Amino acid sequence: MSGVLRGLAVVVQDVELARALYREGFYGRFLGYDKVKRDEVDKVSAPLILALYEALYLAERGRIKVVAEDGAEIPPEKLAELGRGMIRNFDDVYKIYKYFRDLGYVVKSGLKFGALFSVYEKGPGIDHAPMVVVFLEPDRGISATDITRGGRLGHSVKKTFTLATVLRQTGEVVLLGFSWAKL
């Protein structure tokens, strides 16, 4: 029931746990595989690679224990602290990830779309992600370039382009979505 912290990721070697986590919410990605569909999970016998924010989310819910390479357990608070030291704006990125997960969405990396996250209603291989999420630092304003970029990106990949930030005063996640419209 554990994953080993290796750099910016947590590796789940136990194949049964890896399959269960992926089946449960499409957490992580299997080493050497792209999008694995739910009905293909039992054929995979590779480790599951979790991003730090995914591992933290699962650890906070008691689904996994994260351990160091020497086997020492890393509690969720310490994992968050490590994340802050390695990833810029880790707390905000995690809050945004958690926000969507808590609403029941499947959240995957949006890197191939030039975004922070791709957000699915059901999961990769089942439906297409209707939304790509880009992180906007809280102290930075929205520029016309951000809006133009968002419109073009959203249109080119047929997804709602969403700017996400966390308000400093309240810690609330705020979203601003752009969809392409033909006039």
From Swiss-Prot:
GO CC, alphabetical: cytoplasm
Using the UniProt record, name the top-level EC class of this enzyme in a single word.
lyase
Q: Per the UniProt record, which EC number(s) apply here? A: 4.6.1.16
Domain of life (superkingdom): Archaea
Per UniProt, which keywords does this protein have? Answer: Lyase, tRNA processing
Q: In its keyword annotation, does this UniProt entry include Iron-sulfur?
A: no
Q: Its catalytic activity?
A: pretRNA = a 3'-half-tRNA molecule with a 5'-OH end + a 5'-half-tRNA molecule with a 2',3'-cyclic phosphate end + an intron with a 2',3'-cyclic phosphate and a 5'-hydroxyl terminus
Which BP terms does GO give this entry? Answer: tRNA splicing, via endonucleolytic cleavage and ligation
Q: How does it assemble?
A: Homotetramer; although the tetramer contains four active sites, only two participate in the cleavage. Therefore, it should be considered as a dimer of dimers.
Q: Which family does it belong to?
A: Belongs to the tRNA-intron endonuclease family. Archaeal short subfamily.
Please give the PANTHER family that the UniProt record associates with this protein: TRNA-SPLICING ENDONUCLEASE SUBUNIT SEN2 (PTHR21227:SF0)
The UniProt function text for this chain reads: Endonuclease that removes tRNA introns. Cleaves pre-tRNA at the 5'- and 3'-splice sites to release the intron. The products are an intron and two tRNA half-molecules bearing 2',3' cyclic phosphate and 5'-OH termini. Recognizes a pseudosymmetric substrate in which 2 bulged loops of 3 bases are separated by a stem of 4 bp.
The name this protein carries in UniProt is tRNA-splicing endonuclease
- What species does this protein belong to? Pyrobaculum neutrophilum (strain DSM 2338 / JCM 9278 / NBRC 100436 / V24Sta) (Thermoproteus neutrophilus)
